[in-house]
């Protein structure tokens, strides 16, 4: 036994010696290149902004390896193209193999090898993968998991060998179709805690609870303050949007990865609300955006990316604004006729634009709705962090500040402090906008017909305001590429001069 012990100790010493030599060799290599090691002595911000054990050379070699791996896979798939084609046929005819699901799973393996990354919603996943068994999917990545109710992800997680969940419970919560009182009754009946069944429970919150690695965001180190691995560096917004978000939602832990100063302001517009929509706020926003369009016509260029988002906590406010702004060619629609740049805060999760207007709506008669809108930081956090460069609030300042609570108070404090520091970056002058007037009106519509005139063609346009306009022969002949642009059925945007 003594000999065995001595032999084991000698073996351990040899292993330690080998490891020490490896460390020395590695240290020698590090001394002669620009690879930065992890330095825990750095201050908080620098530590999070650092990128240890990585450099440009590593990135290039990583990319080369990836390209070579793709070539190997391409050749393998070419050599086995008959199997790939057979797998596609099996996948399209799953009902024939319902009693032999191992064949369906084998077909999935070939399909997933051919298409390594397959994107789906949970609703589509339940139909697409209903015949797959446990651990048949190698890696599952769930994005925006803070919005997903836990039960929606069960089937996908059950079928996956590895799961990575990405989300932020501090942003939009899951949308529930069931009243919170019913949730309380179900929770009591089945004896489960709020962690599993409540209006704040999500795939992200449950994954955070199950994660062995994470972070206590509160000093009390309670279970409720435990979150998964936080990515604290924020690279989207300039200040003060970053500061608003960091203060109301993240206890100051976020690190600014996009330094610089943006513009902000609170336009104090009051009025009587009809289902939370305040006509005066709509009129103000119409004139404000109209003025901005004249300064930058790209705002309504449908081929360009969105420059401005208009968002609101309330559905009716968003709808009324989308209709009002449609008249100046601002509102954009998808193929189903749904506005894409005007909507509720919930519809803009994950999106971004240089400029965001948050229209609060409500009046004293709907003060309860106003309190709800700012009762928790989630919606203000999402609204502020949609804006990359400029963030403006439109609403009754007195009404909302009287709602109380940390969210609106701290948001206002950040904007007020920013105003003192950078007065040139503040835009909150309501009067100059309301007094602004010109004789230019921009209309959006559809070309109803193109006809031949005496000297050139002319066109009749049906505006979205249901009025009929004419593009006369002079304008038609002066328009570059007119035959393609001014064609029947095309959507166009144009300006008209009022006649006094």
Model-inferred region functions:
Residues 1-30, 180-182, 189, 236-248, ...:
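The feature marks helicase ATPase cores and/or their adjacent C-terminal helical subdomains
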Residues 4-138:
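Conserved helicase NTPase catalytic core signature
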Residues 90-91, 96-248:
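ASCE P-loop NTPase helicase motor core
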Residues 118-119, 141, 164-166, 311, ...:
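Structural motif
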Residues 179-229, 365-456, 464-470, 478-483, ...:
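Helicase C-terminal subdomain and adjacent C-terminal extension
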Residues 246-326:
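Conserved helicase/translocase motor-coupling segment
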Residues 294-309, 316-385, 397-403, 416-421:
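Conserved helicase C-terminal RecA-like lobe
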Residues 361-362, 495-500:
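Short, charged beta-turn/beta-strand-edge "cap" motif at the junction between a beta-strand
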């Amino acid at each position: 036994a003594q000999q065995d012990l001595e032999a084991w100790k000698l073996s351990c010493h040899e292993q330690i010696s080998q490891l020490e030599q490896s460390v020395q060799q590695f240290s020698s290599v590090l001394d002669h290149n620009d690879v930065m090691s992890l330095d825990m002595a750095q201050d908080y911000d620098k530590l999070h902004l650092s990128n240890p054990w990585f450099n440009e050379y590593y990135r290039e070699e990583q990319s080369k390896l990836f390209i070579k791996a793709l070539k190997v896979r391409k050749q393998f798939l070419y050599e086995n193209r008959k199997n790939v084609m057979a797998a596609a046929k099996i996948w399209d005819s799953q009902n024939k193999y319902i009693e032999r699901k191992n064949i369906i799973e084998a077909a999935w393996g070939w399909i997933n090898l051919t298409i390594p990354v397959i994107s789906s919603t949970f609703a589509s996943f339940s139909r697409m993968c209903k015949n797959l068994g446990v651990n048949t999917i190698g890696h599952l990545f769930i994005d925006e998991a803070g919005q997903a109710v836990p039960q929606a992800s069960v089937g996908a997680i059950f079928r996956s060998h590895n799961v990575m969940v990405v989300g932020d419970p501090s942003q939009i919560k899951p949308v529930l179709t069931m009243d919170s009182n019913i949730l309380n009754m179900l929770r009591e009946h089945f004896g489960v805690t709020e962690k599993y069944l409540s209006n704040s429970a999500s795939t992200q919150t449950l994954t955070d609870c199950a994660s062995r690695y994470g972070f206590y965001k509160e000093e009390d180190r309670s279970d409720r303050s435990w979150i998964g691995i936080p990515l604290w560096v924020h690279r989207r917004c300039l200040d003060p949007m970053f500061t608003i978000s960091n203060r109301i939602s993240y206890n100051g832990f976020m690190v600014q990865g996009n330094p610089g100063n943006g513009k902000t302001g609170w336009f104090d517009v009051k009025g009587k609300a009809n289902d939370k929509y305040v006509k005066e706020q709509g009129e103000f926003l119409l004139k404000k955006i109209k003025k901005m369009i004249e300064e930058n016509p790209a705002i309504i260029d449908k081929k360009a990316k969105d420059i401005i988002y208009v968002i609101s906590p309330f559905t009716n406010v968003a709808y009324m604004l989308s209709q009002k702004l449609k008249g100046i060619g601002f509102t954009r629609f998808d193929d189903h006729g749904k506005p894409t740049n005007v909507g509720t805060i919930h519809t803009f999760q994950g999106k971004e634009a240089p400029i965001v207007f948050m229209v609060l709506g409500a009046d004293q008669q709907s003060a309860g709705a106003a309190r709800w809108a700012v009762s928790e930081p989630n919606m203000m956090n999402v609204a502020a962090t949609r804006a990359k460069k400029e963030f403006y609030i439109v609403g009754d300042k007195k009404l909302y500040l009287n709602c109380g609570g940390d969210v609106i108070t701290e948001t206002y404090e950040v904007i007020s402090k920013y105003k003192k520091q950078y007065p040139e970056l503040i835009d909150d002058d309501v009067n100059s906008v309301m007094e602004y007037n010109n004789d230019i009106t921009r209309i959006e519509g559809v070309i109803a017909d193109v006809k031949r005139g005496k000297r050139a063609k002319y066109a009749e346009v049906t505006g979205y305001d249901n009025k009929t306009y004419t593009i006369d022969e002079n304008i038609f002949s002066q328009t570059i590429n007119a035959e393609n642009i001014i064609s029947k059925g095309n959507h166009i945007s144009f300006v008209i001069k009022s006649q006094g």
